[in-house]
Amino acid sequence: MGKTLAEKIFSEHVGRDVKAGEIVLARVDIAMAQDGTGPLMINEFRELGFKEVKVPKAFLFIDHASPSPRKELSNSQKMMREFGKEMGVKVFDAGDGISHQILAEKYVKPGDLVAGADSHTCTAGGLGAFGTGMGSTDVAIIFGLGQNWFKVPETIKVVVNGKLQDGVYAKDIILEIARILGSDGATYKALEFHGSCIENMNVEDRLTISNMAVEVGAKAGLMPSDEKTREFLKKMGREEDFRELKADPDAVYETEIEIDATTLEPLVSLPHYVDNVRKVSEVEKEKIKIDQVFIGTCTNGRLQDLEIALKILEKHGKHPDVRLIVGPASRKVYMDALEKGIIKKFVELGAAVIPPGCGPCVGIHMGVLGDGERVLSTQNRNFKGRMGNPNAEIYLASPATAAATAVTGYITDPRRFI
């Protein structure tokens, strides 16, 4: 009997054939924590009596409150830097960028098992790795032992065929999946992506889809590793990390869903649940006023996302009543955007370009909303209070829809600007 991608990766990391439903002890290739979870992880690591870090690649990321907006957070970040020096763990600091983007650029390989004290570690699935979020204690154990127990998940096969029409993007695909499955429809399962649309999709778009697998409850969102993966790794200067990795043709899935990409329209997730998804063309008729537009995050803060948004805004300009915030996902994205003149153009259009990091998305700083305000963001979550104010409303959409909304001042279908 064939194996799913999840079963293949766990079999390699356990050292024997394993199947969905088994509880296994597996070695981990990459472990990480960020500044919200890192201090907890470090305290647990010390309390458990560990003296050295045994996971092959261990990282700490200061990205959530970066640069630090208050002294309490500064002290927590200081602890992380000191731990990094003591244990030989690389610390990515203010301005370096968001953990998931950096891991994709520099470290994640197809077939890796990646565990992070951050729920969006599933982003690694875009490169054919099993990335999953875990609690700080579990990650502390991985730091200290290089392994942990896992339950090999059942897999939902998601088949996306056809070609996306102009104005429709990977973000719309994952919002459609959220609409179909609901916010808990894949709890403790893996999503595995197939179909002609996925095969023709670059890794940047695959990362967007894998990033939001957790928003339907999934432990991981797994893409095949193929020539598109090789192209991405070559672009990142590490083609040697490539290996082809796909599920077996006779793999057994818990269930299967099919999506026809050709029929998809731009979608928007309305407050306060990610699965509260509607067509932008319908919502546009309601003329929902938007106060702030945020283009960035680990979901949609890559170079191509900024380029898509700029193309619309450059032609049509920003509405004077909209605050536009742009956040490149990493230092590399920021530098590439600088070299291409993208940052300069955003600034000239009236945008606030912020350092690479998570700040607005997690409601810590650089974009906290006022009471009664509405934001349209390219991020991955819109539950009440996510961006720092429970009395505000968060709408989720693609960079193109975000840009079109910044042009008009209300939620707008981007297809009329393309």
Swiss-Prot record:
Its EC number is 4.2.1.33. It catalyses: (2R,3S)-3-isopropylmalate = (2S)-2-isopropylmalate. Its cofactor is [4Fe-4S] cluster. One of its GO terms (biological process) is L-leucine biosynthetic process. Binds 1 [4Fe-4S] cluster per subunit. The keyword Amino-acid biosynthesis applies. Catalyzes the isomerization between 2-isopropylmalate and 3-isopropylmalate, via the formation of 2-isopropylmaleate. NCBIfam families: hacA_fam (TIGR01343), IPMI_arch (TIGR02086), PRK00402.1 (NF001614). Belongs to the aconitase/IPM isomerase family. LeuC type 2 subfamily. HAMAP family: LeuC_type2. PANTHER family: HOMOACONITASE, MITOCHONDRIAL (PTHR43822:SF2), HOMOACONITASE, MITOCHONDRIAL-RELATED (PTHR43822). Heterodimer of LeuC and LeuD. This is 3-isopropylmalate dehydratase large subunit 1.
